């Protein structure tokens, strides 16, 4: 009697060996539409060949890490240099990776806030926040700011500002590199009023020693530890 088929797991997901530049990767190309099409084209053009070789792609190693382990890894893998994040977002665009998954600005803000833990007074239990989701969403916000198309830039810029302000005001969740790069992206894309700048400056930490300690401690990868509401600002 044959055994029933088991659902596919991450471990059993087929991967394709591809050399990008000088580096060989084993990749689940279903997550990267451009490479999926590239492999299909090469396989049809050269049926006997099992070697897939692509020219170098800028910051591909970091882009792949973000796809496989969560976009929060992108902030951890790059310096707080907006130009590098521009390159990375352009690479995701080139690879046709759907970073935003059709999410609206409101949905992105909601996911940013998902990192906040809470306390259920009726059941007397703590409700853990999902830091991983919130930190991954911070990169989605960055991508939206850098490459997003806005139908009403004046109206949407206010919504984006609220998201950025929430992010920079929650240092327990969003570490220094994230806060620095997302703020820089907003200030590059939109006109920042004096009032908005003052609101952002209120939450800026400038002590180099403390920032270095914070940056060095941003190493969690799988289960990010829970936290609870840490500022007096919310949107």
What are these regions (language model features)?
Residues 1-3, 220:
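Low-complexity, intrinsically disordered flanking regions
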Residues 3-5, 10-114:
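Canonical BTB/POZ domain core
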Residues 76-89, 98-235:
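Alpha-helical protein-protein interaction/assembly modules
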């Amino acid at each position: 009697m044959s055994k029933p088929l088991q659902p596919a797991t991450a471990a059993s997901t087929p991967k394709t060996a591809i050399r990008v530049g000088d580096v060989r990767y084993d990749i689940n190309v279903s997550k990267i539409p451009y490479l999926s099409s590239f492999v299909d084209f090469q396989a049809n053009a050269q049926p006997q060949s099992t070697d897939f070789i692509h020219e170098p792609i800028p910051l591909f190693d970091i882009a792949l890490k973000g796809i496989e382990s969560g976009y929060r890894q992108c902030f951890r893998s790059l310096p707080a240099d907006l130009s590098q994040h521009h390159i990375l977002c352009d690479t995701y665009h080139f690879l046709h990776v759907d970073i935003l998954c059709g999410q609206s600005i409101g949905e992105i803000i909601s996911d940013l806030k998902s990192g906040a833990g809470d306390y259920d007074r009726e059941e007397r239990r703590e409700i853990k926040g999902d830091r991983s989701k919130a930190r991954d969403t911070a990169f989605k916000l960055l991508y939206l700011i850098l490459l997003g198309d806005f139908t009403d830039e004046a109206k949407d810029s206010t919504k984006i500002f609220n998201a950025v302000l929430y992010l920079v005001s929650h240092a327990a969740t969003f570490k220094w590199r994230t806060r620095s790069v997302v703020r820089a992206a907003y200030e590059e894309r939109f006109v920042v009023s004096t009032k908005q700048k003052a609101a952002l400056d209120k939450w800026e930490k400038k002590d180099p020693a403390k920032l270095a300690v914070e940056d060095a401690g941003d190493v969690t990868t799988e289960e990010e530890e829970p936290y609870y509401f840490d500022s007096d600002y919310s949107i």
